[in-house]
């Protein structure tokens, strides 16, 4: 890996809101959580011309190869900054909102902790496509328009939504906290998706929610054996005029 400033410079070129190109295909990868085999397989299959890779956060903790996983992703981001995009998950926000267990962070020296914390602060919060997709780690933030995502500050309520937010298929907006995680219901989901003019949400974060929810307008991906025996990714055709439901995505086990 290059020095800290080189990595920060590359990540800083991306805004908090990534606007994906309208060409080729996008591969969305859920929590990898130290499952380096999953990350390596994604690159072996899809790191090629015509494909953009969007990782949805949570690269560390839980799995056996957290450091190897995040260092590999950062190295690849340096090699192909316009082909690989790294979103922030709650496990990358440890320095902002600590949690436990956090085996990756707790094993680092003070110097190493500072190094990775500074890098993770530059990760993006969301990605959108021209044909109706929005991707975040948790839930879409309660902003009035997409451009406001660029102004979200770490530690804010909006930041907690995109990194820590849970969804449940029941009526309601904000439904309170469970285990420190803010929970949002069906009314919030519908309101935000309509307000942001997006048709399908692709997210990660919740390993035990159904993969497809909200009448096929929400897809939750887990791409790690840390939680489940099966690992999934999703591929979107960025050249389609519109993507209106999850059915129009290619969901694959890796």
Task: Walk through the language-model features, giving the residues of each.
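N-terminal active-site segment of His-dependent metallophosphoesterases
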Residues: 1-72
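Beta-strand-turn-beta hairpins that frame and shape the catalytic cleft
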Residues: 20-27, 128-134, 215-217
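Active-site environment of divalent metal-dependent phosphoester hydrolases
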Residues: 33-37, 61-64, 91-97, 141-143, ...
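Conserved beta-sheet core of the metallophosphoesterase superfamily
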Residues: 78, 108-111, 179-241
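MPN/JAMM (Mov34/JAB) isopeptidase/deubiquitinase module and associated MPN-bearing subunits/adaptors
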Residues: 242-254
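Active-site-proximal loop/helix segment associated with metal-binding centers of metalloenzymes
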Residues: 2-5, 9, 102, 111-112, ...
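Active-site neighborhood of divalent metal-dependent phosphoester bond hydrolases
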Residues: 51-52, 62-152, 157
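Active-site neighborhood of phospho(di)ester-bond hydrolases with catalytic His/Asp-centered motifs
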Residues: 28-30, 53-57, 85-90, 135-136, ...
